[in-house]
Amino acid sequence: MATKKHGEACHSEQSEETWFAVRQSHIHAHASQIKSKDRVSQRGEVFTAEREVNAMLDLVANECLRPDSRFLEPACGDGNFLAAILRRKLSELRRKYKKSPRDYEKLSIVAIGSLYGVDIMNDNVEECRKRLFNIWNEEYTAHCKADSFDETREAAQFIISRNIINGNALTLMCVDAEGNDTTAPIVFSEWTLIGSTQMQRSDYTMADLLLHNDTSKKDGMGNLFALTEEQKEEGGIFLRRYITHYKRVQDYEGHRDEL
């Protein structure tokens, strides 16, 4: 995780559509936690050490085991938090579906679809995407063996490309190669398993999700995707929806610059 000078850890109420925002307090920057002094001074970029990552995730350990518990990292860096969460989710799936490669495959796609990240640095975004896919693919190949398919790998890569975004979490806009805001809003895709094999993708701008999200609770907990269908559509925040086999989500590109 790349962090600014301050932050806080918080999580949403436990439900089937839980959304987590994971942040951290400022920590002393060891050499392994920074890429360069310039990036620290210009962007406040400091990566979270593994010990701190695991200590924070242990506070919500049960949610880290559910494939559909959603986590958002608004300054994800190269993915320290998201990678650790994914490992926990996949480890639990492997334990529960030791003898069922098909169920493991399907739910591992749900797990990868539950992780969201934003970072202003393009190289961090690329590294985070690659890191998450490599973790997922290593576990998928090891567990499913001959029952693993390139089609499913393509689906996982596509979902990761939609969920890990090169953007500015403060302005809620995508950014260019220099980290400057573009005219394209950050868009998140909600991935929902329907029945045994169908997956529904619903796209919303991050700005509208935050605007309509209930953050009035004293504990600061909220759920970005907790709105009813009527609220989403009446509020004008729903952008598009696709339903297809979970292995074929990549058939619907839905480029952000077309919004």
Regions found by a protein language model. Give the residues of each.
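SAM-dependent methyltransferase catalytic region
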Residues: 2-6, 13, 19-26, 30-259
